[in-house]
Design a protein with these regions (language model features):
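Extracytoplasmic gate region of multi-pass secondary transporters
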Residues: 30-31, 209-258
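Cytoplasmic helix-loop-helix junction between adjacent transmembrane helices
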Residues: 108-146
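Helix-loop-helix hairpin linking two adjacent transmembrane segments in secondary transporters
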Residues: 133, 142-188
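A late C-terminal transmembrane helix in Major Facilitator Superfamily
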Residues: 324-360
Length: 394
């Protein structure tokens, strides 16, 4: 590979990492500000959890559109549209804040989610088609770039929310999305193989080797979405930690995801994705049980942050690489769309249920509910098909 080609690939990975970061940042703004938003809008945890569930469901459903759309019009164009319109949608949050309306907040969040939903299946399809060597490692680097940017988001969001109003935190990241959209399109060429007939959702569901992965992915989504929304508030209400330190704890969890993404990608290329997924599933279970059961709460929180941060994020490049390996190139967008729908869409149901359990029985009950799905994911990880996809990278 020439230096020019290598430099171009590095720029492409950096841009994808930035896009990945902003895509996730839009949805980690609310958790550290949740108490402030609920108080400002006058709603309960069940209501805010219900709104988050609807937005997350659309975030998942939109992936069913984003994947095939990327196969048809090009991943680069699809990602540009995603960034531009999800960024513009954040400005509606200012209206929600002024009107103190949960309904306007819901409109803003669902529009953000709908446009942002195009990103994940499209980006993973683009990576699997553009980078032919060490796909899992590249997936990991893409994740590292995304997580690095997201790491500071909870604290930045908290700072802006407390000092200027929670809506301005959304607007800042929306502006960054718009600026990145303006520079994204020209840095990616048309992917080879676009003339092939693109796959459909039905075609994706016919790939029998993917069914075990799909069910495993649903279990992951059912604990992930609840933890993502309620972890900072859990620390505030059940562990007596103030909002600033709860935001810092959430930031640290994301920070441990940076080495997690890199480790997961490297390990999947070396030993195969199945072993990585079993190990990371066990790590997630250890983290949640430590948070709930260790009598010294601060120790439990530290164990949770380290183990969950590394384990959860390490599973992503391994799972994404294996999914791409088992999928025909012309169907990868559709396949990734199905996978992100099951993870983010179906998984979003846990946000409403966890919010209801927290209101009715307390946050411990909600987190035991989420832990049950982590244990199910661990059991299912042993059923994932073995594959030699890592040999392609050696």
């Amino acid at each position: 590979m020439s230096k020019l080609q290598k430099s171009k690939e590095n720029i492409q990975i950096a841009l994808l990492g930035a896009a990945h970061s902003l895509n996730h940042s839009l949805f980690v703004i609310a958790p550290p500000l949740l108490s402030l938003i609920m108080n400002d809008l006058g709603v309960s945890k069940s209501v805010i959890g219900g709104v988050a569930t609807i937005a997350s469901l659309l975030y998942g459903v939109g992936a069913l559109v984003g994947g095939p759309l990327g196969d048809r019009i090009g991943e680069n164009r699809t990602i540009t549209v995603c960034l531009m319109f999800s960024g513009l949608s954040t400005f509606i949050m200012l209206i929600a804040s002024v009107m103190r309306s949960i309904y306007v907040y819901a409109v803003a969040l669902t529009l953000m989610a709908s446009w942002a939903s195009l990103y994940h299946p499209t980006a993973n399809s683009l990576i699997s088609k553009t980078f032919k060597v060490k796909v899992a490692e590249t997936m990991g680097l893409h994740g590292v770039g995304g997580t690095l940017g997201v790491v500071l988001t909870p604290y930045i969001a908290w700072f802006l929310g407390v000092n200027f109003g929670w809506s301005w935190a959304f607007i800042l990241f929306g502006v960054l999305c718009i600026l990145l959209a303006l520079t994204f399109l020209k840095n990616f060429n048309k992917v080879e193989g676009r003339d092939e007939k693109s796959g459909t959702i039905i075609d994706a569901l016919k790939i029998r080797e993917l069914w075990a992965l799909l069910i495993f992915n649903i279990a992951i989504g059912l604990f992930m979405k609840g933890v993502e929304l309620f972890f900072p508030t859990y620390l505030e209400e059940n562990r007596g930690i103030n909002s600033m330190w709860a935001s810092i704890a959430y930031t640290m969890l994301l920070a441990f995801g940076v080495p997690g993404q890199w480790i997961g990608g490297k390990a999947a290329d070396k030993v195969g994705s199945k072993k990585v997924l079993i190990t990371t599933s066990a790590g997630v279970c250890i983290s949640l049980l430590s948070l709930l059961l260790l009598p010294a709460y601060n120790i439990g929180i530290v164990v949770f942050i380290v183990f969950y941060g590394i384990s959860f994020y390490a599973h992503q490049p391994a799972l994404n690489s294996l999914t791409g390996f088992l999928s025909p190139q012309n169907q990868r967008g559709a396949v990734y769309g199905v996978f992100f729908f099951t993870s983010f869409g179906v998984g979003s149901l846990s946000q409403f249920i966890a919010g209801y359990l927290a209101d009715t029985y307390g946050f411990d009950a909600a987190f035991y509910f989420l832990t049950a799905f982590a244990l199910i994911a661990l059991i299912l990880s042993f059923k994932i098909p073995k594959s030699s996809e890592h040999k392609r990278s050696l």
